[in-house]
């Protein structure tokens, strides 16, 4: 539920390396 400061509209979350995932076009962590 914490925004990772990255969008995932066009590309996947690079922050997935630290546990972030794409939700509603924005990368979130928990």
UniProtKB/Swiss-Prot annotation:
Keywords: Disulfide bond, Knottin, Plant defense. One of its GO terms (biological process) is defense response. There is a cross-link at residues 1-30 (Cyclopeptide (Gly-Asn)). Pfam families: Cyclotide. This is Cycloviolacin-O3. Expressed in leaves, petals, petioles, and runners but not in roots (at protein level). Disulfide bonds join 4-20, 8-22, 13-27. It comes from Viola odorata. InterPro entries: Cyclotide, Cyclotide_bracelet_CS, Cyclotide_sf. Belongs to the cyclotide family. Bracelet subfamily.
């Amino acid at each position: 539920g914490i925004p990772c400061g990255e969008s995932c509209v066009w590309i996947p979350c690079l922050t997935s390396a630290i546990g972030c995932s794409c939700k509603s076009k924005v990368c979130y962590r928990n």
